[in-house]
Amino acid sequence: MWHLWDGTHFWISGTRSRIWCRQIGHDPRVSLCIEALAPVAGHIGVDGTAEVLEPPAFDIWPLSRRLAEKYVGRGDPANAAAVDAFVANMMTEPRILIRLTPEVWRAIDMRVYRGKRADREHQDSA
């Protein structure tokens, strides 16, 4: 799931037809977990309230483009054509944005585990 953190909210892209998007429209209580493997395995989790935003009441395209730049473009201006093509395709779908306002934060830093990995590979070698 693509996400963007702006310092106050998480922004998540979806479509009206996806079940999870429709469920958020009925019940705005959400949890989000973001995992990372490098440079150190860990994750953050947030519980909060989500709001479904969609055109024409909200211009979703500037933030949708930032999401595409993050994941398709990977921050490299040389990938601008790929980002443009991806956003053009997104605009053919019934897109929405989810604005998640965190209320509770959790974090786990896996460096506390021997070998700095808390995965099956480490467990099998113990």
Residue ranges with predicted function:
Residues 25-26, 91:
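Alpha-helix boundary recognition
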Residues 42-126:
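Charged, gly/pro-rich active-site loop segments
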Residues 18-19, 58:
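A generic structural signal for alpha-helix starts
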Residues 26-27, 100:
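A short, compositionally biased
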Residues 19, 39, 106:
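Flexible, glycine-rich phosphate/dinucleotide-binding loops
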Residues 16-18, 27-31, 76-86:
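Short acidic (Asp/Glu) patches
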Residues 1-16, 22, 30-36, 43-46:
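Short beta-strand segments
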